Amino acid sequence: MESLIQVQDVVQRFIREQPCWTTFLLALGSFNALRIIYQTLSVVLQTFVLPGTSLKRFGAKKGAWAVVTGATDGIGKEFAMQLGKAGFNVLLVARNPATLAATAGEIEQKYKVQTGTFSIDFAAATEEKYTALGEVLTGLDVGVLVNNVGKSHNMPAYLVDTPRDEMRDIVEINVNATLRVTYAILPGMVKNKRGLILNIGSFAGAIPSPMLATYSGTKAFLSTFSSALGEEVKKDGIIVENVNTYFVVSKLSKIRKSSLLIPTPAPYVRSVLSKVGLACGAAFSGRPNTSTPYWSHALLDYAMTLVGIPSLFIRYTHNLHIDIRRRALRKLEREAKAQ
């Protein structure tokens, strides 16, 4: 006991002997250390321990529908499958009627739910097509909307070298399609006082990506759109999330092999649906209504937040894309010579 009192006296004497600015810096350092500990624990709990909002809140197993765009391949198909498994009827929206029918049949057979399909090419969708989609949606009790359809550049390129039709398609698919489909479904969600809107975003929307400027800009739109819309409809019991995503094995990413940072669609989608309402890795990023739920993506997002030097990541991404473009052009040259 005496030794503890002596230690306390020594500490108090040391503090009294220090100038005021030293005490201030010590207090500031202690505060920052506690803040980082608190934030880290919060991210870990949200990512690995706490459950998200139950899908039953949005009508699972109660006859409600889930609408998924880009629903016949990769992440979109996996969302459709897992939402069907959760007890939602599923409306699949994509380009190819044959793959739509096959995916719908697979969901019906496996999960004994209703399905519907709507074929639309969002890159060239007319007003008549959007009107027809609205008519299909009329009368459906939509509890979940997954704005998954997306398009990136064929390869990294500077804006001056990017084909105009590629830029147009990226904006039409990533921005306009999200706006139009959300606009068609939202009134029903507001009326029913419940709903979940998942906008599948990208790290490219959080960190500007040179040589993918158009794509990066459209994903930044999803982030701000989700933040604004989420605040608007919070009073109506609707959750809007920009799902911040690093790479996932898919045709869009052109990645075929999984790794710690690059999951296949199944575990990625499970993480999204199990963490609804939790920001996970984006908890302290300053991006409201954004979630980074897949565990390795969450840790990466949080680490980038702690570093807090966007210019560093922008330069890294620029150099990475220069290398990717160089390798892609070499591959095209080899293929041309082989013909």
Swiss-Prot record:
GO annotations of cellular component type: endoplasmic reticulum membrane
Q: Among the record's GO biological process terms, what is one?
A: fatty acid elongation
UniProt keyword Oxidoreductase present: yes
Residues reported to bind NADP(+) = 67, 96, 121, 148, 215, 219, 248, 250
Membrane topology type: Single-pass membrane protein
Keyword terms of this UniProt record:
Endoplasmic reticulum, Fatty acid biosynthesis, Fatty acid metabolism, Lipid biosynthesis, Lipid metabolism, Membrane, NADP, Oxidoreductase, Transmembrane, Transmembrane helix
Catalytic residues, per the record, are 215, 219
Q: Which CDD domains match?
A: 17beta-HSD1_like_SDR_c (cd05356)
Q: Matching Pfam families, A to Z? A: adh_short
Compartments where located: Endoplasmic reticulum membrane
What protein family does this chain belong to?
Belongs to the short-chain dehydrogenases/reductases (SDR) family.
The protein in question is named Very-long-chain 3-oxoacyl-CoA reductase
**Which source organism?**
Coprinopsis cinerea (strain Okayama-7 / 130 / ATCC MYA-4618 / FGSC 9003)
